[in-house]
A protein has these predicted regions:
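Alpha-helical transmembrane segments and membrane-interface helix-loop junctions
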Residues: 1-173
Length: 173
């Protein structure tokens, strides 16, 4: 189990590095676009449509790609009062069950995102002219990445559960 986890973690490390780079680039582009829009609107008393729309689409990608990183790092907001009261092995099982429930939700989330992309394949956005399916593609992309991160979380917790059952006192998953 530890070997499988090692290879999955190495692969996800690479995915996370790419995601962090893409998120950083998207954030810089968003700041530049919004700054441009503010200058255009309040200094030059002019406006355009594309900048606000593009910033909104970039924000959706940033949020969903960032959510995948957050799942992997256990960084999502959670109420863990009851979870922390459990013994370590029971906590592992509870995390696995909750993560499996999250995966079920994410499968539906991805399916909805794919349906939305397919239904909007022939329409374009009014401001930028890009296909709406590109804007909505963040849903299945983010969902799949969150599922992959969730699988890694499950493997970490199961590895910890097994190793604690084999008599180890402290386990780093």
């Amino acid at each position: 189990m530890r070997t499988v986890l090692h290879y999955v973690a190495k692969g996800m490390d690479g995915v996370e590095r790419i995601l962090r780079l893409l998120i950083g680039i998207a954030m810089v582009i968003m700041v530049v676009i919004i700054f441009y829009q503010v200058i255009l609107r309040y200094v030059l008393n002019s406006s355009n449509i594309w900048s606000e729309e593009l910033a909104r689409y970039l924000m959706c990608y940033v949020v969903l790609l960032g959510a995948a990183v957050a799942v992997r790092k256990y960084s999502h907001l959670q109420v863990d009062f009851a979870l922390n009261m459990l013994p370590v092995r029971a906590r592992c099982i509870a995390v696995v069950i909750c993560t499996l429930a999250g995966i079920v939700f994410l499968v539906y989330f991805c399916q909805y995102g794919i349906d939305l992309c397919l239904n909007t394949a022939n329409s374009t956005s009014s401001g930028t002219g890009i296909p709406m399916s590109y804007a909505y593609a963040c849903l299945p992309i983010g969902g799949v990445l969150m599922i992959l991160a969730s699988v890694e979380v499950i493997l970490k917790e199961l590895t910890k559960f097994i190793e604690l059952g084999n008599g180890k006192k402290e386990v780093q998953a």
